[in-house]
A protein has these predicted regions:
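N-terminal membrane topogenesis motif
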Residues: 1-24, 80, 84, 221-248, ...
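Signature of the first transmembrane helix
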Residues: 6-67, 94, 101, 105, ...
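Interfacial/gating helices of multi-pass transporter permease domains
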Residues: 32-53, 181, 185-186, 229-237, ...
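Membrane-interface junctions at transmembrane-helix termini in multi-pass inner-membrane proteins
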Residues: 135-157, 366-396, 407
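Hydrophobic alpha-helical transmembrane segments
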Residues: 157-171, 179-212, 396-400, 414-435, ...
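Membrane-proximal transmembrane or re-entrant/amphipathic helices at the cytosolic face
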Residues: 466-520
């Protein structure tokens, strides 16, 4: 019970932090978009695409590797193994981080000239390169804190990092954005660099303090595993993840380069292409993915829990956890999807004053259950040691995505990109879920997990819409934004009520959740 309650409190902490950071991030994105315009947002997204590949190279699967091996050492109560694992993991992070830094720094002119086709991106790329070793080290140490179940330390640094990033962004944009697009991009890059360097240094300091408090340094005559043996175990985890990440990130970067080019072939101007790309990728998608922060925290914490159960061959416990994850993820995601579809126009026009953004939110919202469930499934597969399979699925996903973008966008414009997102998300989720069900022998309950929540959210949003049409004057005193909040909250309450009445939420589930708090 102590482990169960510890998992709950850590999950609640990470959920709160994730929701806070995602809320602040979306709010900041709204402000930034209003300051620099859709074209600059599009160029920034292209830079982020290249930076994303560089970060992937710097990380090379180290967070998962550190989490899994430290969790394995804790499960076996093997302190010398943990000590050697951490030495190898930090070395891994620094080597790959420095290599990625040099590649991006010296390759920036070629990337800016021939890939992004915009030399205004060069300073931003070089600033981003300097931060890569710090990002890699921070990822490694975050994996350590997840494994030892002290995520509140890394969570606190994440909050401070985001506050620093946004504060610097707003400060620098006020002074630099008026000098043109290049200066605005430079302000964004400098802000991120300051925050990333702070995060890496702060996490390393916390790690040193945590090691001193909780893990004694092995004596000089203690028998330690060799660097070679631990390094091989670490690479056996990180390399499959890294190779998949390289391929997927490289293909995604290529995909993001092809999208504006495809829109130009469809008939858009260069500026309009960047603006349309920015509207979908940096405005609509963040809103759709925002509620996923609530589940993302749980998914990350599942890896060490499932890893320890897998090492101990506790198959019944694994199936029990997986059943709970599937049930609660779909209950939450279907509700979010239905409410977002029902109020997409209000969300788009309120956040961005853009009907185009509202339309893209409506089109992408039906994918929310697939996206969120795929994320949770991926975490459970990694906990079961199935990272090689995940690698194959991710490469297939990214390859089909690039091919679809190349073929569809010149003919269908932005709708071609929407179709691409649907095809790849459905394929990735299907392959991952089928694999997890096969290896865990878990039996899905379609009626309870899917049909009942779907019926509940349709009833809840329809009734809310009907009441709003019948008595719109009752919401006039709270204003337009306040009315949207009231409508969404009312829909959530009705969804919860219908879910209980129709059996999507059962007494056994309520007792299970209550047991975390009551200690029974």
């Amino acid at each position: 019970m102590q482990n169960k309650r510890r998992f709950l409190w850590q999950a609640l902490l990470m959920t709160g932090v994730s929701m806070l950071l995602r809320s602040v991030g979306v709010s900041a994105q709204v402000i930034i978009a209003s300051r620099i315009g859709a074209e600059a947002v599009g160029v920034s997204s292209l830079i982020s695409g290249v930076g994303g590949f560089a970060i992937t190279l710097a990380l090379s699967g180290i967070q998962l590797g550190c989490t899994r091996l430290v969790s394995e050492g804790l499960g076996k109560q093997d302190a010398p193994f943990i000590h050697r694992t951490l030495q190898c993991a930090i070395a891994h992070a620094l080597v790959f981080g420095l290599f990625s830094c040099l590649m991006l720094f010296f390759g920036a002119p070629l990337i800016g000239r021939f890939w992004l086709r915009d030399l205004r991106t060069l300073p931003s790329l070089r600033i981003m390169a300097v931060t890569l070793p710090f990002i890699s080290l921070a990822s490694c140490l975050s994996g350590y804190f997840v494994a030892v179940r002290r995520v509140y330390k890394s969570a606190g640094i994440q909050v401070l990092e985001e506050i620093l990033r946004i504060g610097c962004t707003l400060f620098l944009l006020n002074r630099m954005a008026s000098h043109g697009l290049e200066s605005a991009l430079l302000a964004l890059a400098l802000s991120s660099a300051i925050a990333d360097i702070f995060s890496g240094c702060a996490l390393f300091w916390l790690y040193r303090d945590d090691r001193r408090r909780h893990f004694s340094i092995p004596a000089a005559n203690a028998t330690l595993p060799t660097y070679r043996s631990v390094g091989r175990k670490l690479l056996a985890i990180t390399l499959p993840v890294a190779i998949a990440a390289y391929a997927r990130s490289g293909l995604i970067t290529l995909e993001h380069m092809l999208i504006p080019l495809g829109l130009q072939r469809f008939g858009h101007s260069h500026s309009d292409s960047l603006a349309s790309y920015g509207t979908v990728h940096s405005m609509a998608l963040p809103v759709v993915l925002f509620p996923g922060a609530l589940l993302g925290a749980f998914a990350g914490l599942l890896i060490p829990e499932i890893t320890e159960a897998h090492v101990r061959d506790e198959h019944t416990r694994i199936r029990y956890m997986m059943g709970r994850v599937f049930s609660l993820t779909l209950l939450y995601a279907i509700g979010v999807s239905g409410i977002m579809i029902a109020f997409s126009y209000e969300l788009g026009t309120t956040l961005y004053d853009s009907r185009e953004a509202a339309e893209y939110i409506r089109l992408l919202a039906p994918l929310i259950p697939i996206m969120y469930l795929d994320s949770a499934t991926d975490a459970m597969l990694k906990g079961m040691g199935e990272q090689v399979y995940s690698m194959k699925v991710n490469i297939i996903d990214a390859s089909i995505s690039v091919l679809s973008v190349w073929l569809l966008i010149p003919s269908f414009g932005v709708m071609g990109y929407i179709i691409t997102i649907y095809v790849t998300e459905l394929l990735n989720a299907a392959l991952s879920i089928v694999r997890l069900l096969n290896i865990s022998h878990l039996r899905p309950m379609i009626m309870r997990w899917v049909a009942t929540p779907l019926l509940s959210v349709v009833a809840a949003t329809s009734l809310t819409r009907l009441l709003y049409v019948l008595i719109p004057a009752s919401l006039a005193p709270v204003g337009h934004r306040g009315a949207i909040v009231v409508l969404v909250v009312f829909s959530v309450l009705l969804y919860g009520l219908f879910s209980v009445l129709l059996g999507a939420v059962r007494q056994e589930q309520i007792r299970w959740i209550g047991s975390f708090f009551m200690g029974k």
